[in-house]
């Protein structure tokens, strides 16, 4: 049979040739089932006529349909979907694990509370290595284009940076005073408030229909500047509770934050194939690291948490709720659009709590100081996910348009 085959509709429609089907972009879902008794074939004209009263819907023109004439194959046979490669499956599993971030962190903390011995193998050196790998993975998501993008939205970026290092540190300080927290818990809560934005905020921003590009830029900006801001603000606000080694905090932040982020950005710029190969496994590694570190911090102080844990949970919830609330309100007051205001709210409300765990473990003598940091990781993950679910139901106007 010749390759040019035409379909004639006997209700007066113009015959459609095989190449015109491509132009019309027909799709199998729009074609009705063709009965063999309704087909007629003329050898002289090499034409197949369809005795049907149906017309081709207008919607067919919007979808592509590749018509391949083969004997014994009906018009309703659809091409089989291409199987996913191993790399695609790894990426799919990684995304699923990352999306369930609050669940894994909650399980890690619950395991540390109920069975503290589970995390006896974790050492302070391991916590540094784990956080370094996490920050390296974050750096691999950055490029020079991201840095150029910061120049196109200076207002949003500056507002986010200002709110990040004003709303959260001050909220932590006032919540500590309001609840009259013990010195070690107050210092830990202030440390959390002075930490940069958390990497999980990028995922939550995406779910909330926020400005993901701005989220990445804000996380990067607050993380890099944390080398100065975190030790400075912590020493200023927490000195009345405990002795703070500002220089030690600065060196640790430089080691586990700035250098890995810059190294990751360098790899992404000049070794793209390597980054493309390892990037699918970095998010689940980061999630696992955070869950283990939080479980370790909880396990180290399980008995104390069982006695006064409610107070720490309440303090952490109030801290992050104030971050989400004031981050959004002040952004809107400054005239920032809804999508970017959602992003700033999430960035301000979600902290890099695991950095607080590492810094508290390394530089504060009382291990209870790390407890608010670990509890904070669970609280902001759950609160942020709930907020994202609410916002996802109402898309910002610029996204709807």
Curated annotation (Swiss-Prot):
The chain crosses the membrane at residues 92-112, 122-142, 156-176, 187-207, 212-232, 247-267, 278-298, 311-331, 371-391. It comes from the Eukaryota. GO terms for cellular component: chloroplast; chloroplast envelope; membrane. Gene3D superfamilies: 1.20.1530.20. It is a multi-pass membrane protein. GO terms for biological process: pantothenate import across plasma membrane. Keywords: Chloroplast, Membrane, Plastid, Transit peptide, Transmembrane, Transmembrane helix, Transport. May function as sodium-coupled metabolite transporter across the chloroplast envelope. This is Probable sodium/metabolite cotransporter BASS1, chloroplastic. It comes from Arabidopsis thaliana (Mouse-ear cress). The gene is BASS1.
């Amino acid at each position: 049979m010749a390759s040019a085959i035409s379909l004639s509709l006997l209700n007066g429609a113009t015959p459609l040739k095989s190449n015109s089907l491509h132009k019309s972009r027909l799709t199998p879902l729009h074609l009705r089932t063709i009965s063999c008794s309704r087909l007629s074939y003329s050898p002289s004209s090499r034409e197949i006529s369809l005795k049907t009263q149906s017309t081709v819907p207008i919607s067919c023109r919007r979808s592509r349909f590749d018509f391949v004439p083969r004997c014994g194959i009906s018009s309703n046979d659809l091409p089989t979907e291409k199987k996913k490669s191993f790399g695609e499956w790894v990426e799919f599993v990684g995304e699923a694990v990352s999306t369930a971030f609050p669940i894994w962190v909650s399980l890690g903390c619950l395991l540390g509370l109920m069975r503290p011995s589970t995390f006896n193998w974790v050492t302070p050196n391991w916590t540094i290595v784990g956080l370094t790998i996490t920050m390296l993975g974050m750096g691999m998501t950055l490029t020079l284009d991201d840095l150029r993008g910061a120049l196109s939205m200076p207002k949003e970026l500056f507002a986010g940076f200002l709110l990040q290092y004003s709303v959260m540190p001050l909220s932590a300080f006032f919540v500590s005073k309001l609840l009259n927290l013990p010195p070690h818990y107050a210092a830990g809560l202030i440390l959390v408030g002075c930490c940069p934005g958390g990497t999980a905020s990028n995922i939550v921003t995406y779910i909330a229909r926020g400005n993901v590009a701005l989220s990445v830029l804000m996380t990067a900006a607050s993380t890099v500047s944390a080398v100065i801001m975190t030790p400075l603000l912590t020493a200023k606000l927490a000195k009345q509770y405990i002795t703070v080694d500002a220089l030690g905090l600065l060196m640790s932040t430089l080691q586990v934050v700035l250098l890995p982020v810059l190294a990751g950005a360098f790899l992404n710029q000049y070794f793209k194939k390597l980054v493309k190969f390892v990037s699918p496994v970095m998010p689940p590694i980061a999630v696992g690291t955070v869950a283990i570190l939080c479980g370790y911090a909880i396990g180290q102080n399980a008995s104390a948490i069982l006695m006064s844990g409610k107070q720490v949970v309440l303090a952490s919830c109030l801290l992050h709720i104030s971050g989400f609330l004031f981050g959004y309100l002040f952004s809107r007051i400054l005239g920032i659009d809804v999508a970017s205001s959602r992003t700033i709210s999430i960035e301000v409300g979600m902290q890099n709590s695991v950095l607080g765990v590492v810094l508290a473990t390394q530089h504060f003598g009382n291990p209870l100081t790390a407890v608010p940091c670990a509890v904070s990781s669970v609280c902001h993950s759950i609160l942020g996910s709930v907020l994202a679910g609410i916002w996802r139901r109402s898309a910002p106007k610029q996204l709807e348009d």
